[in-house]
Amino acid sequence: MSVLGELDLLGPRAHGAACGEAVLKAVAEDFQVDEVLDIPLSGEGEHLWLWVEKRGLNTEEAARRLGRAAGVQQKNVSYAGLKDRQALTRQWFSLHLPGKADPDLGAAEGADLRILRRTRHSRKLQRGAHAANGFTLRLTGLRAERALLDARLERIAADGVPNYFGLQRFGHGGGNLVDARSCAEQDLLPANRNLRSRFLSAGRSYLFNRLLAERVAEGSWNRAAVGDLLAFTDSRSFFLAGEEECRDARLAALDLHPTGPLWGEGDPPSGAGVLERELALAGSEPALCRWLAKAGMAHERRILRLPIQGLAWHYPEPDVLQLEFVLPAGCFATVVVREILDLVPTGQTENPCAY
């Protein structure tokens, strides 16, 4: 089986060649993620919400430990999004405890997991409920000219970056996509829920990245065309662009963006040449598109351009670059980094990115 590389799974950079190279995640503290939740918690209800800090531990394992310590089934443990194992992350979990007092969760805690806050709420934490993720990245072993770095950082702060799905969506060497293709060709879905979700996500993400890569290559990823479906940064709704919408000032302000397809049932609701391009993509991957539709996936959209909120940087040491920024939920920090620097492999088996 051939190993799929970064260009196979993502696509070209938008802002030119990398300015240099660095190491990301020499230690967990080099990659810090804080979930941003815009839900006012009531302090009462049958769901116990936990603000958890974890180090070197993935979200699913943290959820299993919390569930075991609380004595509840895994289906009663919820979280908004997956976070990388090779990082220091803080995120919310909820436990469904109807008619029960707060359990002793000491058995779940340790050097790699700490519960920082507990509160009650009337509803469980839904997947995708977080508004954003805040990142603090420490890039070490830096080999690049500061003037070039500063200019590139100023540019991506002003213009955003292509909103590719990151490498980890596809598994090591693109293995999740390989398995998704195999399932599509055999017209089957894994019985295991986690595997099914992983493979479907890999297939949809690959098709989106293919479309985005085409538009990056021709320089249209950050411009609206007649027939595009436009969406605001934090909205899942979209509307069709005519000539007037293509002149909307909110496009230049990075509030409004063209979108690409997250494939599902039916044809994309885009128009004109945009629809032709998206149907041509589907025609190049017929088995994958049929499989996604048959699995009951709804056709959705994802913004092509990723605005970077609050980007700040400094150099705490001569060979260290520290970045701080906020991204919408579901977006990947390393697609920001790849527009700045090449990452030097550290021998880790997981890809160096989180969302």
Curated annotation (Swiss-Prot):
CDD domains: PseudoU_synth_EcTruD (cd02575). SUPFAM superfamilies: Pseudouridine synthase. Residues 160-306 form the TRUD domain. It catalyses: uridine(13) in tRNA = pseudouridine(13) in tRNA. GO terms for molecular function: RNA binding; tRNA pseudouridine(13) synthase activity. It comes from the Bacteria. Transmembrane segments: none annotated. It is an enzyme of class 5 (isomerase). InterPro entries: PsdUridine_synth_cat_dom_sf (IPR020103), PsdUridine_synth_TruD (IPR001656), PsdUridine_synth_TruD_CS (IPR020119), PsdUridine_synth_TruD_insert (IPR011760), TruD_catalytic (IPR042214), TruD_insert_sf (IPR043165), TruD_pseudoU_synthase (IPR050170). GO terms for cellular component: cytosol. Belongs to the pseudouridine synthase TruD family. Responsible for synthesis of pseudouridine from uracil-13 in transfer RNAs. This is tRNA pseudouridine synthase D. It comes from Pseudomonas aeruginosa (strain LESB58).
